[in-house]
């Protein structure tokens, strides 16, 4: 059994999917890219990131760009700018769509769980 980090009761997982371009290897495996955030809902900080691409280096780099970001305080514009300026993979636009979708789910969750 793999070791799993204890994120605590305030951490919630938000994921969104978007269609990948047809000309990249990940499309043959997944068809879509998933972008998932583990967000501490008390602080708004992204504690971990999941991206369903093939290359571990790519997944690790995208996580590096996003982990620690306060999505509650700062929104997603900075995340999108980082991906736009520092990630030049063919899946860039799909990842940005996934970020927007995961953020929308976070906002929806916050509205449903006020109080």
What are these regions (language model features)?
Residues 1-17:
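Short, compositionally biased leader-like segments
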